[in-house]
Amino acid sequence: MASSSKCAFLVFLCMIVLLAPSEVHAKSMAKAQGGWYLVEGLCSKFPDCNKHCKEQGFLGGQCLKLGVNMLCFCIHT
């Protein structure tokens, strides 16, 4: 019984770490629905995400909820 509660605590701790807001400005890409999405950052930093992404040379962009944050994703195919 004690080991299952320890396991549950570790899973809970990992979820907190993974979902916590991060100030890391590294860009990451994810493949989804036939295209690549580049994460530019928090939508609060890019209020017009679509315009920002087009200025960066991408097809466009949109703010999507990922965890507790709204992130600006630029679309690249």
Swiss-Prot record:
Disulfide bonds join C43-C63, C49-C72, C53-C74. InterPro entries: Scorpion_toxin-like, Scorpion_toxin-like_sf. One of its GO terms (cellular component) is extracellular region. GO terms for biological process: defense response to fungus; killing of cells of another organism. SUPFAM superfamilies: Scorpion toxin-like. Transmembrane segments: none annotated. Belongs to the DEFL family. This is Putative defensin-like protein 30.
